[in-house]
Amino acid sequence: MELELRYSAEDISRIIEQALVYQCACPAQIATTLLELRDLFDYQVKCGDTDDTNRRVHEAIARATAEAHTRMERCLDEVLDIEGWDRNTLTMPEALRARPTKSL
């Protein structure tokens, strides 16, 4: 089982960096969630249980994680489009760079 990635780890790091520098939490929260889902997926896939029940448990978690990851990548696409990010450079638009600070 493989996880399909629309965004590389470097892309996600760039989004988080932009969001932290310019204090815009929403894209960073989604990006951080994607990294956490990737870690969870990797753990479930690599868990080498040979016991049938445990194997099935890990497969179920991996499948659900892959589905959540796909949905969150689509959500990130939508958020970046709505906010007007430059999709080639993953640069936040100027208008968002001056927003007041909210909790990251």
Language-model segments: residues:
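A conserved regulatory-domain signal marking ACT and ACT-like small-molecule sensing domains
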Residues: 2-3
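Short, charged/polar, low-complexity loop and linker segments
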Residues: 6-21, 46-56
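Short, charge/polar-rich alpha-helical segments
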Residues: 19-31
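Amphipathic alpha-helical binding modules
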Residues: 62-104
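Amphipathic alpha-helices that form helix-helix packing interfaces
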Residues: 30-33, 37-40, 44-47, 57-75, ...
